[in-house]
Amino acid sequence: MQHARKKFRVGRTSAHNRCMLANMLKSLIHQERIETTLPKAKELRRCADKMITLAKKNTLAARRLAVARLMVRYNKLTSKEARQAKAGDLSAYNVDRTVINKLFDQLGTRFVSRNGGYTRILKLQNRVGDNARKCIIEFLAD
């Protein structure tokens, strides 16, 4: 029996979970709406609410915490990104910068008057292949 088990585990290692949630959180901040499975969305909601609370503070320490939690790479380019940068395409590299700026400049100011509950989960039909519960997670309008 596993009483009070609060960790998000779906058969992946902890490093994989951490990276997956960071990538999903970046996508959610960038697009403000993503489609995923219900267990992932419930865990993502916890992370997103914490990030918005950080963004509402809008201090240097809060920005540094957000960069660390989102695993943003400002000065490191992978070999693929380096090839793209030589060709003049920095889209993958600039997404991380725009995510942090959007989090603090737009989303943080949008939810200043709200004390919590910044996201909404809308349930969809189950996925055809494996019958997984699908949903849409999105930020509220204001």
Swiss-Prot record:
Q: Does the keyword Ribonucleoprotein apply?
A: yes
User: What keywords does the record list, in alphabetical order?
Assistant: Ribonucleoprotein, Ribosomal protein
Domain of life, per UniProt, equals: Bacteria
The UniProt record lists the keyword Zinc: no
GO CC field: cytosolic large ribosomal subunit
Q: Which GO terms describe its biological process?
A: translation
PROSITE patterns given in the database record = RIBOSOMAL_L17
Q: Name one GO molecular function term.
A: structural constituent of ribosome
Q: Which InterPro entries match?
A: Ribosomal_bL17, Ribosomal_bL17_CS, Ribosomal_bL17_sf
Q: Sorted alphabetically, which Pfam families does this protein's record hold? A: Ribosomal_L17
Similarity-based family: Belongs to the bacterial ribosomal protein bL17 family.
What quaternary arrangement does the UniProt entry report? Part of the 50S ribosomal subunit. Contacts protein L32.
The record's section on NCBIfam families has: L17
Q: Under which name does UniProt file this protein?
A: Large ribosomal subunit protein bL17
Organism annotation: Chlamydia caviae (strain ATCC VR-813 / DSM 19441 / 03DC25 / GPIC) (Chlamydophila caviae)
